C-alpha cells in the first residue's frame, strides 16, 4: 500500500529486496552457482570511504540501491571513481540534468548511464539520486564469487 492507502502502488517492497537477496544465496548453494548477496539497511547504506557499498564495487560486485528520482526506485551501481558512482538507471532520459554534477552517459549501455557524486547520493533529502533518510535506506550487494577481487586473490608476493 502507498501513502494514500492504494494497494499495489508502492513499488518494490523492502521485503521483496530481502527475499531476492536470500533467494540468490540459496539458489547459488543449491545449483552450485557462484553468486553471493547481502541485504543492507540504514547506516550500512552509504557511499564513501570504508562503506560496504564502495567495498563491494571495488571488489567487482554490483549494488542494487533504492534512490529518489521523482519517486523511490532502484538503480544498479556498477562502478566508482574517487568521488563519483557509476550507475545504471532503467528510467530513460534524453535531457541533461539541472544539477550539472549528475552526468548523463550515452556511450556505455552495458555498464552505466549515469555518473553521480557521492555527496548527492549520501543526501538524506529527496533530491535526484539521494539515498534519503538513513532509516529508510536499503541496498543489495551482489557478487560473482569466482570473479570477486578479494585480498587473497589480488596480493602479489615478492621474494
Put a short name on every predicted segment:
Residues 1-136:
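Conserved active-site-adjacent core of cysteine acyl-enzyme catalytic domains
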Residues 1-2, 70, 137-159:
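Mixed-charge, low-complexity intrinsically disordered regions
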